Amino acid sequence: MAATLRELRGRIRSAGSIKKITKAQELIATSRIARAQARLESARPYADQITQMLTTLAADAALDHPLLVEHPQPKRAGVLVVSSDRGLCGAYNANVFRRSEELFSLLRDEGKQPVLYVVGRKALAYYTFRNWYIAQSWTGFSEQPKYENAAEIASTLVDAFMLGAGEGEDLQTNNEQSVDELHIVFTEFKSMLSQSTEARRMAPMVVEYVEETGPRTLYSFEPDATTLFESFLPRYLTTRVYAAMLESAASELASRQRAMKSATDNADDLIKALTLMANRERQAQITQEISEIVGGANALADAR
């Protein structure tokens, strides 16, 4: 009985220690989520403006840029998987990996070989453990991505896409560094309680038109619209990668906040249940000790 009581008290102490950790993680995630949301909201006007500019240029430019042209026989599809660097965020990474596997299956059914690029230590560890070939990985900034990080990633992806563009089917098929399509898997932030894992194609690109609220403005371009259009396309792709990373960062923090709150609540419930069991055990122990004392006293009285 004494051993059982010691075990219960040990479990209560362990649950209390875990509760301190989960509560701290919950508070940290709560403090960071507001900044992540602010960064996401502040980046949207820029994304809308560059999309609007690209739309305006597309009205006058000849749309024959390699980033807009479908490959006649696509064989390799680059997939950028955006995960987290740290755990303790519920099913956030599991949902990303599940959506990625669905995309890989779809690409294989279409006769395309997936070429993997990953963001975040969790994706790197997940696919390394499963012996996947990873073309390139980026880690260390999943919670606070910078535009420079997105620019580096987008540059790598564009280089892989452009490597075989226009060079002939044999070169593009045989070159292990080239891809014919680009896709991204990330988590879209909708609210603190709602996030969805998305898989979207980035290249060949389809320009997303932003509807103008007022009269359409006519522009005079210097240099010509086609040159500007070609200059803006890589920047547009960088913006899409950056936006996806900001969405994922906010989603990661929201998932961690919810997961840690749930863990803290569960620890509270466990501590209450164990405390009740310990109290009952202690009461039973005291009752037994009293019974033994009374029994001993009665035995002495009878002996006299």
UniProtKB/Swiss-Prot annotation:
Pfam families for the chain: ATP-synt (PF00231)
Alphabetically ordered keywords of this record: ATP synthesis, Cell membrane, CF(1), Hydrogen ion transport, Ion transport, Membrane, Transport
UniProt-listed InterPro entries: ATP_synth_F1_ATPase_gsu, ATP_synth_F1_gsu, ATP_synth_F1_gsu_CS
GO molecular function terms noted in the UniProt entry: ATP binding; proton-transporting ATP synthase activity, rotational mechanism
GO biological process per UniProt: proton motive force-driven plasma membrane ATP synthesis
Membrane topology: Peripheral membrane protein
Keyword Chaperone tagged: no
Main location: membrane
Cleaved signal peptide residues: none
Quaternary structure annotation from Swiss-Prot or TrEMBL: F-type ATPases have 2 components, CF(1) - the catalytic core - and CF(0) - the membrane proton channel. CF(1) has five subunits: alpha(3), beta(3), gamma(1), delta(1), epsilon(1). CF(0) has three main subunits: a, b and c.
Entry similarity comment: Belongs to the ATPase gamma chain family.
Protein name: ATP synthase gamma chain
Protein species of origin: Mycobacterium ulcerans (strain Agy99)
Annotated gene: atpG
